[in-house]
Amino acid sequence: MAPQRKRQDGACKKTCPIPAPVPRLLVKGGVEVLEVRTGPDAITQIEAYLNPRMGNNIPSEDLYGYSNSINTAFSKASDTPNKDTLPCYSVAVIKLPLLNEDMTCDTILMWEAVSVKTEVVGISSLVNLHQGGKYIYGSSSGCVPVQGTTYHMFAVGGEPLELQGLVASSTATYPDDVVAIKNMKPGNQGLDPKAKALLDKDGKYPVEVWCPDPSKNENTRYYGSFTGGATTPPVMQFTNSVTTVLLDENGVGPLCKGDKLFLSCADIAGVHTNYSETQVWRGLPRYFNVTLRKRIVKNPYPVSSLLNSFFSGLMPQIQGQPMEGVSGQVEEVRIFEGTEGLPGDPDLNRYVDKFCQHQTVLPVSNDM
């Protein structure tokens, strides 16, 4: 009888495939989920959307998402646009959970925006050619679709978006209901470094007056595109598979100061032409999916400054006579440091020059 073959241990043992590691979902839900305390390596995703602010900004209005009919000036001197004809920026603030209980450490945790998925929602609604409006050919044809000038912009940051003012016509008079450049002059038709603002109000900053400031916004990432023309067809893409990385060349994303995330956008799809050939702006909402992580950073707030701000906040606010500025009533301030020999002239004029050297001004002779 032939000897039996030896069984090799483990030769026929099957191994189960190992799944690829992916982030483990801890919890999901509404904004109340942000109150859940998570570990230092936790990643948070926030989904939000911003509605357009074209002029009719109340959801119950019939023209919600549109502006009113654009009123065109007969001359530069009579350029007075109405508030409900001015597309404005949309903005929102999302309050994030407090990360630090002890602010006296040399390092603290801050929320860092890492990436964002975003897209304009409702592009398919522009296919509508039966809602009423100017006919393409005749009464038996469809109406002219939304077309013309388009503007798309969004921003994600740890601070409000910083704006630079620049207008097409400095003689335009904007209504008080919106934020415009104060005391506009011809220089505002170019870059005036004094025309600055913070995007701190929703639906108040007209797109035609303000744009993101390229010299600022170190803690914000913004993106935009513009297509001009009277009959230019709108061209927009939509997908849920494109991620925009918010990290800079140093691998750092926007750090959310005060544990707040700022979202802003403006999406003008074009103009709709009515039967009477008046035109209204059409805006669309934008969806955001922002990924945040916790980042260890050096504490920028010294304990001494925190204590000073705390104690100064305990003092009552007094409205007194001016002690600072142009009308300040402080006559003189003297600072003494260390000791010196008794000077023979107590009225010597002393100062520290730009090289940090102590200088003494010699007295002027009274001899004529």
From Swiss-Prot:
Phosphothreonine sites (modified residues): 339
Motif (Bipartite nuclear localization signal): 5-14
Cellular-component GO terms for this entry: host cell nucleus; T=7 icosahedral viral capsid
Cross-referenced SUPFAM superfamilies: Group I dsDNA viruses
Xref: Pfam families: Polyoma_coat
Written domain comment of the UniProt record: A DNA-binding domain overlapping a bipartite nuclear localization signal is present in the N-terminal region of the protein and is required for efficient virus formation. The intrinsically disordered C-terminal arm interacts with neighboring pentamers. The unstructured nature of this region allows to make different interactions depending on the structural context: pentamers present at the 12 icosahedral fivefold axes bind five pentamers, whereas pentamers present at the 60 icosahedral six-fold axes interact with six pentamers.
Subunit-structure text: Homomultimer; disulfide-linked. The virus capsid is composed of 72 icosahedral units, each one composed of five disulfide-linked copies of VP1. Interacts with minor capsid proteins VP2 and VP3.
Protein's UniProt name: Major capsid protein VP1
Record organism: B-lymphotropic polyomavirus
